[in-house]
Amino acid sequence: MYAVVKTGGKQYKVSVGEKLKVEQIPAQLDSQIELTEVLMIADGESVKVGAPFIEGAKVTAKVVAHGRGEKVRIFKMRRRKHYQKRQGHRQNFTQIEIVAIA
């Protein structure tokens, strides 16, 4: 059984027991969260597709960790103008573990 959920502006294919990193969610460590924006649920041969979401469907997940991703380096330069700009960015993330799909 698997589901497709939307969180943080992205879509993820998830199944029970799977761990994944999503955009930062304001929740405490070891707390349970419910992802209610479920786009699709597949269980063997039966497949439910929402328009856009499936009513009453939810995916329960446990918050495992919060952290920051790897640094992305940005370098801007204008040729012949002696303009150079260096910048870095680290995106915050939340690691979750899927507990149940309903």
Curated annotation (Swiss-Prot):
Per the UniProt entry, what are the Gene Ontology biological process annotations, in alphabetical order?
Answer: translation
InterPro entries listed in its UniProt record: bL21-like (IPR028909), bL21-like_sf (IPR036164), Ribosomal_bL21 (IPR001787), Ribosomal_bL21_CS (IPR018258)
Q: Name one GO molecular function term.
A: structural constituent of ribosome
Output the Pfam families linked to this UniProt entry. Ribosomal_L21p
**Gene Ontology cellular component list:** cytoplasm; ribonucleoprotein complex; ribosome
Cite the entry's keywords alphabetically.
Ribonucleoprotein, Ribosomal protein, RNA-binding, rRNA-binding
Family to which the UniProt record says this protein belongs: Belongs to the bacterial ribosomal protein bL21 family.
What does the record note on quaternary structure?
Part of the 50S ribosomal subunit. Contacts protein L20.
Q: What does this protein do?
A: This protein binds to 23S rRNA in the presence of protein L20.
Q: Which PANTHER family is this protein grouped with?
A: 50S RIBOSOMAL PROTEIN L21, LARGE RIBOSOMAL SUBUNIT PROTEIN BL21M
Could you tell me what this protein is called? Answer: Large ribosomal subunit protein bL21
| Origin species | Neisseria gonorrhoeae (strain ATCC 700825 / FA 1090)
Its ancestry begins with: Bacteria, Pseudomonadati, Pseudomonadota, Betaproteobacteria, Neisseriales
Gene expressing this chain: rplU
